[in-house]
Design a protein with these regions (language model features):
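Metallo-beta-lactamase
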Residues: 140-151, 252, 256-262, 268-385
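Active-site metal-binding motif and surrounding structural segment of the metallo-beta-lactamase
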Residues: 139-140, 150-200, 483
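Alpha-helical segment of the N-proximal tetratricopeptide repeat
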Residues: 446-478
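Divalent-metal (often Zn2+) His-rich catalytic cores of metallo-beta-lactamase-fold enzymes
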Residues: 28-40, 301, 311, 327-391, ...
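Conserved beta-strand hairpin/beta-sheet module of binuclear metal-dependent hydrolase folds
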Residues: 107-167, 291-296, 300-306
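Gram-negative bacterial Sec-dependent N-terminal signal peptides
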Residues: 1-26
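Feature captures hydrophobic
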Residues: 25, 471-477, 484, 488, ...
Length: 658
């Protein structure tokens, strides 16, 4: 198991604790059944496996390999192992336990190194989940999206310097607000150079707020689910994790963030960055809440961030996130096509590999544009015919012109869950049938389900027959009821695990495979409580506004315990943070900026720097108070009372069991 890769994925996670916990003896994964082998083999006749264009493009411009040394942290923890996917070899036929289409994608994303995209534009691939792009200009270099971790980003820069010479970084660009596109920035530049004006950081409007806020309120649950989505609990091998579809996996180093100095605010905004002309296109609410694309005139290059890649992307992330809107997404791509399609010779994204040649550029833009538009429009067409979310997903088919294009295959997103997300985007979770309006909760409903079906043994006997016939979806669905009715029924857990495992072996989507196989692993062996990550890096905490901080506290208030409590507190953060009135009443914590209550129970005075240290657990409130860094006047017990109503979130909560 990869202890050091737990939960870093695409979130604001920070450093791991140093404690080590024992693992249970794990039951080994099983082989692919005949039904799974048959399902996977059918794909060879359905998809154009003879088309090797992507492999040619993925190798084009190769300069140097990624260093093969394991990247480790100060405590010896593995941050990135370049050899962990060495079992995925280009040219090998897919194993029985991996969907052939996903295997092909895994081979492609495993192609790593420093590449020349065009004269003066270079890209480092497979040193993290995302790519890092380096653009040579008049005075130095501009770095686009410095990976997840400072450690991997530094190795990437060293690789570039070794092959292209030492050049000063004059600018950094964040394409959007996800952590794999800014987290390694301190491995690329020094913040002092940003403050002095030596280095500029460009970003789309709203990036800093979105980077901090998107995951922080639901950070614990999103991180736990991310451990499923990215397969961080699985061993990388042919019966385990083979990649995430978007990249191989995430690094497990230090997430950093330096605030942008220059914001792009509107489509058509042009900036000269180190002698090159950038024409920007805003794309908020597409793949990320804050995102932008651009065209470099001198290079005839479209940078599509993460809106045009070599996969059907998520319009909903299985780790949990706000639903993304396929219609605006499609329109942004159409706008890029109309603005630059007649002159672009290259499409470059921050995942996967570039596309060269105007005809190919236009073809890819049109195909991805129509992919997201088709999902939007046809979901609504079918919904307007009275079909429900699950009925639409079960009957939804892309036209062959879209479905048989490799770049549109569901390696990260999937047609099924993107369609369901689009339904929920417009119509919400309720399907309109009053029988589903107030269903029993999972455990209670499962017990009645098992009772009505004649008991667990009867269900398992029938389910085993369905398993032998290859009906794995139904087996997983029905046996999950038995597990939720009696989580100690190991026979049920094992049968559900077997079914999930076969579904994982058949899955084309990397996240689907990872969810299935992680669920199977936890059903068989229980939840392995590995070292727990902090859910916010120091830079993320420092970037939180006071409003975000108080909202974060409010999420931790146990409303039932605090239902009858009342407290009014003033917080004074000084010149760098302002004053806030905080009120606890009706189990709710409200705050008001710029106001001090005359009837406050207590006033807490501290600097923003001290607040950051307390949030990061670098010191306790008591320690800071004893040192005089926190001053409390009034009724101290009211503050203690408020803090006593706050829940601590258990990270390793159950997912496949109650």
């Amino acid at each position: 198991m990869q202890r050091n890769h737990i939960v870093k994925s695409l979130l604001i996670t920070g450093l791991f604790t140093t404690s080590s916990l024992p693992l249970l003896a794990a039951e080994a994964p099983k082989n692919a059944t005949a039904a799974t082998q048959q399902a996977n083999n059918l794909l060879y006749n359905q998809l154009p496996f003879s088309d090797n264009t992507d492999f040619t493009d993925a190798h084009k411009g190769f300069i140097a390999p990624i260093p093969q040394d394991v990247i480790k942290g100060e405590q010896g923890n593995v941050i990135w192992d370049p050899q962990q996917y060495a079992f995925i070899k280009e040219g090998d036929k897919a194993p029985d336990t991996v969907n052939p289409s996903l295997w092909r994608q895994a081979q492609l994303i495993n192609i790593s190194g420093l590449f020349e995209v065009t004269d003066g534009v270079y890209q480092i691939r497979n040193l993290d989940l995302s790519n890092m792009t380096i653009i040579e200009g008049k005075e130095g270099i501009t770095v686009v999206d410095p990976l997840v971790s400072a450690e991997t980003a530094k190795v990437g820069m060293d690789l570039y310097y070794k092959n292209r010479g030492q050049k000063p970084v004059v600018a950094v660009i964040y394409t959007h607000s996800h952590v794999d596109h800014y987290g390694g920035v301190r491995g690329v530049i020094d913040e002092a150079d940003v403050k002095s004006g030596k280095v500029k950081i460009y970003a789309p409007a709203g990036l800093l707020e979105e980077a901090v806020s998107e995951n922080i309120m639901a950070g614990n649950v999103m991180s736990r689910r991310a451990s499923y989505m990215y397969g961080n609990l699985l061993k990388p091998d042919v019966k385990g994790q083979v990649g995430a579809g978007l990249g191989t996996t995430t690094s497990a180093g230090t997430v950093t963030l330096i605030a942008p100095t220059n914001y792009i605010t509107k489509t058509g905004q042009k900036e000269t960055i180190d002698g090159l002309t950038y024409d920007f296109l805003m794309a908020p609410g597409s793949e990320a809440p804050s995102e932008m694309l651009w065209f470099i005139e001198e290079k005839k290059l479209i940078e599509t961030a993460e809106d045009v890649t070599h996969t059907l992307h998520n319009t909903y992330s299985l780790r949990g996130a706000k639903i993304r809107q396929p219609l605006p997404w499609s329109k942004y791509i159409n706008e890029a096509l109309n603005l630059w399609g007649d002159k672009a010779e290259i499409i470059l994204a921050q995942h996967h590999w570039p596309t060269w040649g105007n005809d190919n550029v236009v073809k890819l833009l049109k195909s991805q544009r129509d992919l997201y538009r088709y999902i939007n429009d046809q979901t609504l067409r079918m919904a307007n015919q009275g079909m429900t979310r699950d009925e639409i997903a079960a009957n939804f088919k892309l036209p062959s012109s879209l479905a048989n294009t490799w770049a549109n295959r569901g390696y990260y997103g999937s047609v099924s869950h993107d369609v369901k997300a689009t339904y929920v985007l417009y119509l919400g979770w309720f399907d309109g049938n009053p029988a589903t309006l107030d269903e029993l909760p999972p455990e209670e409903g499962a017990k009645k389900f098992v009772e009505y079906m004649g008991g667990a043994d009867a269900i398992l006997q029938k389910a085993k027959q369905d398993y032998d016939q290859g009906n794995f979806r139904w087996v997983a669905q029905v046996v999950s009821k038995v597990v939720f009715a009696d989580p100690n029924n190991q026979a049920a857990r094992n049968l559900e695990a077997d079914a999930l495992e076969q579904l994982g072996y058949q899955a084309e989507s990397g996240p689907w495979r990872n969810f299935y196989l992680t669920g199977a692993q936890e059903l068989r062996n229980g939840v392995q409580k590995l070292p727990t990550p902090n859910t916010a890096s120091p830079d993320t905490v420092r970037a939180m506004t006071p409003e975000m901080f108080f909202d974060y506290l409010a999420v931790h208030i146990n409303g039932e315990k605090a239902a009858d409590a009342k407290a009014v507190l003033n917080f004074d953060f000084g010149e760098d943070g302002g004053t806030y009135k905080v009120e606890l009443e009706n189990g709710v914590l409200n705050h008001t900026a710029g106001v001090e209550a005359s009837n406050a129970d207590a006033t807490i005075t501290l600097s923003r720097d001290v607040l950051n240290k307390i949030v990061l657990k670098e010191e306790t409130l008591k320690e800071a108070t004893d040192k005089g860094d926190v001053k409390i006047t009034g009724n101290v017990e009211k503050l203690n009372e408020l803090l006593g109503y706050m829940d601590n979130f258990e990270f390793w909560f159950n997912i496949v069991t109650p």
